[in-house]
Amino acid sequence: MIRGARAAVFTVALALSARPASAQQGGVIPLPARIIPGSGTFQLNAATVMQVPHGDANALSAARYLAELWKRSNGLTLAVSATAAGNEADARIAFRSEPGFGPEAYRLEVAPKRITVSATTGAGLFYGAVTLWQLLPPGRNAAPIPAQTIVDQPRYVWRGLLLDSSRHFQSPAFVRSMIDWMAWHKLNVLHWHLTDDQGWRLQIRRYPRLTSVGSWRIPASVPGSPAPQPYGGFYTQDDVRGIVAFAAKRHVLIVPEIDMPGHATAAIAAYPALGAGDDASLPVSAKWGVHSHLFNLEPGTFEFLQNVLGEILQLFPSRYIHIGGDEAVKDEWNASRAVQARARRLGIHDPDALQSYFTQKIGRYLRAHGRRAVGWDEIMQPGLTSDAVVMSWHGASVARAAAIRGNDTVLAPDPMLYFDHRQSSLPGEPPGRLASISLEDVYRFEPHDSQLTDIQQRHVLGLQAELWTEHISSGRRVEWMALPRAAALAEVGWSSPQRSWPDFLKRLASMSARYRAFDLDYADSVFGIDARLARTAGAIGVTLSNLTELKDAGLDSAIRYTLDGQEPNASSMLYAAPLKVAAGTEIRAATFLGADQVSRTWSVRLDGHAGVRRSSHELELCSNGVGLLLEPDGNSGSTEAPLAVDIMNPCWIYRDVDLAHGPQVLAAVAALPFNYELGLDAAKIRAGDNQTPDGELEVHVDGCDTAAFSVLPLAAAAHHDGVTVLPAQKLPPIAGRHDLCLRFARPSLDPLWALDWVEIGD
């Protein structure tokens, strides 16, 4: 749990003692602060006794959680018993409370006859138990554990993840599961984003329309298609109480966020009198992006917000309450006579100062009830009180400014810790932001700011990654986008800054096995297979690699493959150089560390399309506006591969095409709903230059501004859901090899046309 308002810091001696020690710690993530090797081993097996002192509730809770983890991940069943001093068994695991440790610190001693976990707090004992769990290799119910002493404590007190339950709703069972795997990584803050323009997800008894109306939206659809079913859901207060209690047992603090004054469309749709605009029939939004709907400044609106917060304070014991404050577009405030009249009465002439007034008023209410306001960094305006916590999403410079002025701050930078970005360029990534934020990017993020004094640095509480869910439509996808990047985040927030990327990868292989044991749908991108196909005379060239240079990291890595459709194993053929494979062959490949498979199996049957068909992932985007991976049918939960598109400029480059023999072009396209709130930027998008009623896919040669070389009409796809293959078009012959530009000419912004794949061949 978060204790007080200062970051925990390592002593110099402890920080200097931190070092990778894979032989002793097996697969522990995050890496402990100090590991001292011992002599001999402790033989852990089903006969081991787990003991706690009579009456020590913290020790009993930690021991029971450890027993539960080992049973679920390793099939090892150990009994937990309370024992009076002097009655300890010889071969035992003992938990004991001792004074003198920090709030989350612990000591774990492994000796040949006993293991002892010591700490002052329940959190310390819990984290000692989690570390001990990870010392047993995954999948084994008995093993020798090397003797060692681990002395450990976190670097930062705030090590968090944001879960956006507004854009897409997750079940209470999933939220509990997420809290569980957060605890395995010693992540201790769940920032729960419960309200936004697209849905209000928390039951407020005094205002039932917040959930009867505000929690439901009609999803966006392509013009002319059948109306979708309403989408939504909400958490009852009983749900929340159960989740909060579950989290407390795992020492995860839940910080609720109720967004204000912006991101308020769902609340205003439920109670129109709260809004600053004139639209009394505003729906809950199905559009992504920044909306202009703000709460107004009437006394009744502040009464509403305080009543809502009053119920929230009864549900969440957290000292911290997040009030949003980001992206509050002031257009409605500026246009509202009522808002402007109130601003004049308050003597406020600047819209940002008006938001500062709003923030201060809410902050005073929370302070009067013993809580602290947390807000996105837009709240950092003159008049911000020193007890407010600034969550910096605009980067280190904003966090630095907050710390210098004396405000506590949490680093949550976009894009580095925005986990709605895909993890790699591999084709198996789910929908999300197109730009990649890799596992290594997260691991190499350094929160320490050398420009701050030691006193100022103590205002940096820690760091947090964000799981915005506009395009993350299910709990399984949340797992993929979070894991294993959450493991890297945990190590940055807990361990010494002297971290080792190669050592982390070795430990991650063990952690990945634990993910599989708990059926978590984690991304294996760091170990995944990057395959390139090229058609050659009489065969298909296959080049395999890893995006991560595993051998350069000192790992015993290998790619192994089969050509008979069988699953690869540690004895399969070793990939050493590009292959030439006959058409019709099914090739399967996977990455191994030693004898252990660490990636999912990549497979493909080399049919007539291999080497000539390129997906939107394999093409280059013509521009870098708002690049997204989108579901091909525009709906949540599609099983088809997402489409890579820049929504500001749907345009792709197909490089190095031989046009000498006049090949044909075959393309698969999809019409998607254009559900983006872009404000004035929407005017920058090209539309209205179509030659046929439904538009065309244009093919240009050596540049996108040349005259169209060929045109594929969209009529065949205009009224179809999902992906449609357009009729093939023969390209005129031109000597040499050329780059092709493919872009859409469309009558309007909606629908958004996207390319699934294109094939250039005979």
Cite the ranges covered by each PLM segment.
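Feature activates predominantly on carbohydrate-active enzymes
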Residues: G100-Q306, G310-Y320, K361, Y365, ...
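Bacterial N-terminal signal peptides that target proteins for export
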Residues: M1-V9
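Extracytoplasmic
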Residues: S603-D762
